[in-house]
Amino acid sequence: MPRKHFIFLIFLFWKFDSAESISVTSKNATEALLRCPPAENFIRTHMAPDFETPRLVRRLDWFQDDSLVASYQQDILADSSRQWWVSDGRYQLIRPFYTLRVSPVTPEDSGTYRCRLETDPLFSSPQSTATQELAVMVKPVAPSSPEIKTFTNRSITLVWTHNAARAHRPILRFSVSVRTVSDNTRFVMAAPSNATTVIVDNLSPYTLYAFSVRAENSAGSSDFGPETTFRTLGESPNRPPQIQKIRNITSECVEVTITPPDEMNGELDKYLVLIQAVNETIPRKMTFDKPTSTPLTICALSPSTDYALAIEADNGFGTSPQATLVFHTEDSVPNWSPSTITTLPVVGKPEITVLWPAPPLNATEKVIKYHLYYKAKNEDQWKIEHLNVSPNGVKSKLFKYRLVDLNPNTQYRIRVSASTIKGEGAQSADSVAQTDVGEPGTVTFKDLNFDCKNGVKLRWNYEPSVNSKKSPTFTVKVTNQTTSLQFNTTMLSLDIIDLSLYDEYTLRIIVLERSTIDNSTILIGKYSDSHQFILKDKCSYQSSFCSPGEKCAKLTSSAGNPRYISVLIVIFAIIIFAFICFVIVHFARGSMNFKHLLKKKEKCVYLEEISPLVYDSAGQEDIPVELFYGYVEDLNRNDSLKFKTQFQILESQTSGIDSVDSGESNSSSDENSQKNRYNNIGAIEATRIRLNSPTGNDYINANYVDSCNERNAYIATQAPLPSTFSDFWSMIWQERSNIIVCITNMVEDGKRKCDQYWPSQQDSPQTFGNYQVTLVSESTNAHFSHRILDLKIAKAVPAVERKVHQLHFMGWPDHGVPSSVFPLLSFVHYTSDIHSTGPVVVHCSAGVGRSGSYILVDSMRRHLISFRRLNVQGHLTHMRRQRAKLVQTLEQYIFCHEAIRQLIRHGITRVHSDLFMRYLHYLSEENLNGKTRMQLQFEDICDCKHQPRCLIESDVITLPGYHRSDEFMVGSWGNECEDLWRLTWQQKVQTIVILNQRDSFWRKLPSCIYDGEIQLQHGDNFVLLQKDDQQLCVRIVNVSRADLDTDFWREIENVQKQRITYHDAPLLILAHKYPPSVPSPTDSTSTLSLSILFNDDTALAFSICAATTLACQLETTGCVDVVQVLSSYTEIQCGIFASKQEIEIIYEKMSQLVGGTRV
């Protein structure tokens, strides 16, 4: 066992004959020296200076409580060494004054000590004694466990008792240990003086504490005594709970994920929820008792409605402040059907106008489409038409739709249903209507017989309207140069007399029918074709049609009118003149400096024609543009060994930058650290943005970052926190920035990465501090969103507004990289087309990894326009000295090099429509190896590098479009099958395009498939799928190769017009897959005919998808990026484009669309 060192404090109280009292203290407690004053005074008075002679002391004894412990006797023995005696080895008499030394002392040594002195009888005081008290002090024992006297929610009064023995007194002080039981943290506080009570304050509410006491004296401290545990009173939480996520689970229910307040001040007992629709006046109250970590489910909500949600946490002692959120419930299938269907047959046409009222006032669903089902009385299958409506458009009180191409004079049953984005609601009751007979048709002349005098017998044929039950009336007009005769008849023949010989007559017949809807209305048809005849003598005549056996000569029409020929000649001459002017202007523009055009910022250019960048950075290697492609390949060798080495050097050179501050750095203060989204990511002091804040706190987690040739070209910052929204917009206003680049999603992997600092709805401004932000417009495609925001000072007079562009790229994962560089490059080029008025603000979540990658790539892009050398590593080192950890991972560092490499190799592939023909001409030029740039583009992006070559084995491939990442699906089913309709139902496909439909495609499947759950109903151009009470109407569009060859874009436009939901649902293209064959990459055709080029319908389908995507991009942005589409398709399926000709046809079709011809 280790030695225990006791510290003894020794008090000596002397008492001798002269009544003198002396006290002696030994602080180290290793020994006690007890003086004998009578002996000392005697020796000093009567003996020589050496205190040894003459020997006048005859005897001296030391007693402890009357027990002899040490003695000196002068004449007891002849042996002088035996004249000294002690009872214990710890005792020792010290000459010359006979001081008693006790070493070491123990608590048993305490008591009354007495020295007795015997001297020579010649002296006046032959005997003298002195007494003293020796007290040995030890560390005290621990006090008892404290008792609770009074308490509150944040303080407690303790009292205790302490039985101290004589060896323990005096007690100098008591100390109290306060331990938090939950995390075992503790602190010690001293009681005032040596009182046995103390008030412990500054405690946390509703917290279990353990209290114990120790005593302290001059010898030391006791151990802490037994603990007393006690829980303080609770109080209402002082912070609101946090709403982590809200999710629509149905149209009437939401799921809210809540975390309790950070300082609960008690056990969570329940959540109090207040929810109120925006158009309601009284909120609905809900209580969730004993909540757990599982989300709360709130139901009985109205679909497609904005709700205000407030949640309070209750711990039994009170409620917390409210956590508030505004959310929008999901739309639902309408639970109502259109009522009061009115059908109005159209007079004179086999058409019916259908009228129905708007949804009920209590209906909250946003109707996007109405479906009209109709069928004739004798038909079995329903036909369907659709009326698209805008949910955000002008609210109409009455809807109208006209059914056309109906059978005349036929009774129809009509139903109407409404659809939201979630599906179709119930159908209305049948409404019955009868169509009119329709416009009368025309007659066809049968024969004309001459009576050899002055009359003719005319006969004709007429096919009456279907279901027409009334006899028509025929009006026959006979005219010559001087007279006009008109005859009415209900017969199919007419005798005409009193005609002149040798006059040319013209015959025309019109049909009249009475409307079956309105008996007072006469329907007038169109005149028949004109026929001429001339009567002559001897029973002969000329006619435009002759009856057999008659003396009739065929009457031919006269030559064309010279006036019309003159007009045609003039029109032809104008066309020739316009064509010559176009050719002159075209070649005149071609002589302009192409490179000068490419340098215009507002145009999309192809970069390889320009000299790229150099960045002069000491100690780093400058790479010529011509060698950069091979330089990156070299870095990639041996599992990217050189990349790893470079990145390690970069990390070592910038490893200490993240801790840079000067003196008392603002970023290190408690107030500023609360403004950081992540504890380890702050703003470097030297380059941070300093806000002009009236509060005096100028900190925001943002830094200036230079481009290669411009200081403070960018601002890299974190995603703003709700508490820093006002600081963020203050920075935008202060720095006059009008471009915000956001490269993160709101939530990633279930974690909040960014809080929404802009309004969700247009014309619904939100105020952040002193600034008001309004969403002006928002456009979204498959990769990013472009929002235009209106920023102004909220209460400024007069109001000053600024337009701010927010570009939100959504395809970059946190700590990762996109699968392809081309969507990012296209996004960078799109952003660069916007004129900036200040630094470009870039943020992801922390503002270092993805933000740094974007800034690095865009900085290289800017300088590649003017320089032909670049230094990526050197510039990134410079950037990291301005904001720590930019380009955070090795994977991002490699990705930036790959993006710059592809930028150099393929240039700016997002080409403006004005420059597309020149760009196409540029691709057709050959290099020194005899290959065109288009061929190199195909080999680099599309060509399959694997052996054997990759083949498409899946029955269906999902491809991205301009609007969605799953906009197209290409299936290779050669026949109708259950898998086809199962996919259609699961993906909610509403339009199917069949390429080159074969007669054997439709197999007439049974009416029930998919385990009997889905019912099929085939129509003329649609298939109706039904499951329970849900229906899905799928329009079938047939497209042939011949039609595509004749007019490609007319067929594409026709497909787009017939899409039921346009881009809201995938477009499924069915193409027959033929046995695989790999065309030679050098095969070529001068006409690029679709029939010759594509020996497989699936390849044609892929090109249709790509062309449609590019057409949408051209229509929306005025630019085309073919490379981005090719790379995204190849990323999904290697070898999807088998030859250069397949991408050449895409360029060919895009050139037609922008108004050019093939170069």
From Swiss-Prot:
**Could you tell me which cysteines form disulfide bridges?**
C36-C115
Residue intervals passing through the bilayer? 565-585
UniProt keyword list: Disulfide bond, Glycoprotein, Hydrolase, Membrane, Protein phosphatase, Repeat, Signal, Transmembrane, Transmembrane helix
InterPro entries noted in UniProt: FN3_dom, FN3_sf, Ig-like_dom, Ig-like_dom_sf, Ig-like_fold, Prot-tyrosine_phosphatase-like, Protein-Tyr_Phosphatase, PTP_cat
Chain ranges sitting on the Extracellular side read 22-564
> What is the membrane topology noted in the UniProt record heading this document?
Single-pass membrane protein
The catalytic activity, as recorded, is: O-phospho-L-tyrosyl-[protein] + H2O = L-tyrosyl-[protein] + phosphate
Q: Which residues belong to any copy of the Tyrosine-protein phosphatase domain?
A: 643-903, 888-1153
* UniProt region (Disordered), positions on chain: 656-677
EC number of this enzyme? 3.1.3.48
Q: What class of enzyme is it?
A: hydrolase
Q: Where in the cell is it found?
A: Membrane
Q: Catalytic positions? A: C844 (phosphocysteine intermediate)
Coiled-coil residue spans: none
One cellular-component annotation, GO: membrane
Q: Which GO terms describe its biological process?
A: neuron projection development; signal transduction
> Where are the Cytoplasmic topological domains?
586-1159
Name the domain of life this protein comes from.
Eukaryota
Carbohydrate attachment sites?
N28, N153, N194, N248, N279, N362, N480, N488, N519
Q: Where is the signal peptide?
A: 1-21
Q: Name one Pfam family in it.
A: Y_phosphatase
Ranges for domain Fibronectin type-III: 142-235, 240-335, 337-438, 439-538
Recorded family membership: Belongs to the protein-tyrosine phosphatase family. Receptor class subfamily.
Give the protein name, as stated in the record: Tyrosine-protein phosphatase 4
What species is this protein from? Caenorhabditis elegans
